[in-house]
């Protein structure tokens, strides 16, 4: 299945892309996707610890192992900063 990942703010800066599509096997969940994202962009590992994640525009925690399906969209949103 294909999952679209959207990167915002610091995660976009570190990954070097705005969005990316990952191929996962049937039965995959958010924790599997997170592992693939870190494998593709190891520098994101430290950034991910402070991010929130949205699965199809609903906030989720990757460790909750939400089931994914083909065509899902996951947004990686770092905390807001600045003034």
Curated annotation (Swiss-Prot):
Quaternary context: Heterotetramer; composed of 2 small (MOCS2A) and 2 large (MOCS2B) subunits.
Q: What protein am I looking at?
A: Molybdopterin synthase sulfur carrier subunit
UniProt-listed InterPro entries: Beta-grasp_dom_sf, MoaD_arc-typ, MOCS2A, MOCS2A_euk, Mopterin_synth/thiamin_S_b, ThiS/MoaD-like
Q: Which Pfam families match?
A: ThiS
What does this protein's UniProt record list under function? Acts as a sulfur carrier required for molybdopterin biosynthesis. Component of the molybdopterin synthase complex that catalyzes the conversion of precursor Z into molybdopterin by mediating the incorporation of 2 sulfur atoms into precursor Z to generate a dithiolene group. In the complex, serves as sulfur donor by being thiocarboxylated (-COSH) at its C-terminus by MOCS3. After interaction with MOCS2B, the sulfur is then transferred to precursor Z to form molybdopterin.
Pathway membership: Cofactor biosynthesis; molybdopterin biosynthesis
User: In which broad location class does this protein mainly occur, judging by the first location in its UniProt entry?
Assistant: cytoplasm
Cell compartment(s), UniProt: Cytoplasm
Q: Glycyl adenylate modification sites?
A: 83
**Species of the source:** Chlamydomonas reinhardtii (Chlamydomonas smithii)
Q: Does the keyword Phosphoprotein apply?
A: yes
- Key words of the record: Cytoplasm, Molybdenum cofactor biosynthesis, Nucleotide-binding, Phosphoprotein
Q: What HAMAP family does UniProt report for this protein, alphabetically? A: MOCS2A
Query: Would you identify the family this protein belongs to, as annotated?
Result: Belongs to the MoaD family. MOCS2A subfamily.
GO BP, sorted A to Z:
Mo-molybdopterin cofactor biosynthetic process
Query: Positions modified as 1-thioglycine?
Result: 83
Species lineage: Eukaryota, Viridiplantae, Chlorophyta, core chlorophytes, Chlorophyceae
Provide any one GO MF term from the record.
nucleotide binding
